[in-house]
Amino acid sequence: MEYNTSELCDLYPDMVDVVEPMFESYGGRSSFGGSLVIIKCHEDKGLIEETIAADGGGKILLIDGGGSSRRALVDAAIAEQAMDNDWEGIVCYGAVREVDALEELDIGILGVASIPVGAISEGVGELNVPVNFGGVTFLPEDHLYIDTTGVILSPEPLDIE
């Protein structure tokens, strides 16, 4: 589904929070939305790999990697598995890699930077905890809407129809 975040902000000014502009789009889909599954980790992609192995049910995986650009938390293998398992997208407050391959995948992917060095995979991190970055607090099951203009957050699904 295509979203217009500007229009959603106009229609629901009291229901949405705007995430500060900090992300670059790396995936093949520039507009996406859904409810959140949250991972908090630092330079470790193990919990990400475990989580995207399950059916995403059209949800968005939000990764709080502390904004680190030293090691990529998302690579082509992770993104492809997420796409195959019905994840709507991945929003990574951290780095990604294999950018050319990511652009070819039919999934939304946002990250703060790209770097060729991959993260370790030890499984250290937290699943479905509140996280705060970009001027907002994200809670599990909140709803995120993304297009080329920006990223907005709502505690409830917005009536788009």
UniProtKB/Swiss-Prot annotation:
Q: Which UniProt keywords apply?
A: Cytoplasm
Complexes and interactors: Homotrimer. Binds to both RNA-binding sites in the C-terminal region of Rne and to RhlB.
Asked if tRNA-binding is a keyword of the record, the answer is no
Query: What is the annotated localization of this protein?
Result: Cytoplasm
| UniProt-listed SUPFAM superfamilies | RraA-like (SSF89562)
InterPro entries in alphabetical order: RraA (IPR010203), RraA/RraA-like (IPR005493), RraA/RraA-like_sf (IPR036704), RraA_gpbac (IPR014339)
Q: Which GO terms describe its molecular function?
A: endoribonuclease inhibitor activity; enzyme binding
Question: Does the keyword Cytoplasm feature in the UniProt annotation?
Answer: yes
What family does the database annotate?
Answer: Belongs to the RraA family.
Could you give one GO CC term from the UniProt record? cytoplasm
- Any idea what this protein is called? Regulator of ribonuclease activity A
Q: Which domain of life is it from?
A: Bacteria
A Gene Ontology annotation in the biological process aspect, one of them, is: regulation of RNA metabolic process
Q: Identify the main location.
A: cytoplasm
Concerning CDD domains, the annotation shows: RraA_family
Q: Which residues form a coiled coil?
A: none
From which organism does this entry originate?
A: Idiomarina loihiensis (strain ATCC BAA-735 / DSM 15497 / L2-TR)
Query: What this chain does, per the record?
Result: Globally modulates RNA abundance by binding to RNase E (Rne) and regulating its endonucleolytic activity. Can modulate Rne action in a substrate-dependent manner by altering the composition of the degradosome. Modulates RNA-binding and helicase activities of the degradosome.
Q: Which residues cross the membrane?
A: none
